[in-house]
């Protein structure tokens, strides 16, 4: 399942928001009824994980951490301690808890951004600004993708 594109929506007074139909249809087609919501580690946005993607992330993280290492346990605890299990109501809405609205600086207008196997939820005001300048984007992409170490020049 690959989520692509972006969509705008508004939260209501209770913090409920409609999951865009394009993403909802993908989840239904994959029989994913449950989503996991957490604050992004690096940005002021929220991340929705389909349950199967969340489980893969948890397994990957758990495999890299030692249960008997206190620092590893602290990292794991921090990663999983503040998540919400989300289910859509009959209208395709879900509740964003108030603490998450505050963490992501969401007032009312939101932008959903499909980011491969997850969906980000941004404050529209923040998402309206470029994440990176076009020049820097081009340079970074060139650096990452522009060299192919597997190609031999004859």
Swiss-Prot record:
Transmembrane segments: none annotated. The keyword Repeat applies. Gene3D superfamilies: Transcriptional regulator MraZ domain. Keywords: Cytoplasm, DNA-binding, Repeat, Transcription, Transcription regulation. CDD domains: MraZ_C, MraZ_N. Its main location: cytoplasm. This is Transcriptional regulator MraZ.
């Amino acid at each position: 399942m690959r989520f692509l594109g972006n969509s705008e929506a508004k939260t209501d007074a209770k913090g409920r928001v409609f999951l865009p139909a394009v993403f909802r249809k993908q989840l239904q087609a994959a029989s994913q009824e449950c989503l996991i919501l957490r604050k992004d580690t690096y940005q002021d946005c929220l991340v929705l994980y389909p349950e199967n993607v969340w489980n893969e992330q948890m397994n990957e993280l758990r495999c890299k951490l030692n249960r008997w290492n206190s620092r590893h346990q602290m990292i794991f605890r921090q990663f999983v301690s503040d998540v919400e299990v989300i289910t859509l109501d009959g209208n395709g809405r879900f509740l964003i808890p108030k603490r998450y609205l505050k963490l992501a600086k969401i007032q009312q207008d939101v932008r959903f951004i499909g980011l491969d196997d997850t969906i980000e939820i941004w404050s529209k005001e923040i998402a309206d600004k470029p994440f990176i300048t076009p020049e820097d984007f081009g340079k970074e992409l060139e650096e990452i993708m522009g060299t192919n170490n597997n190609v031999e020049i004859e």
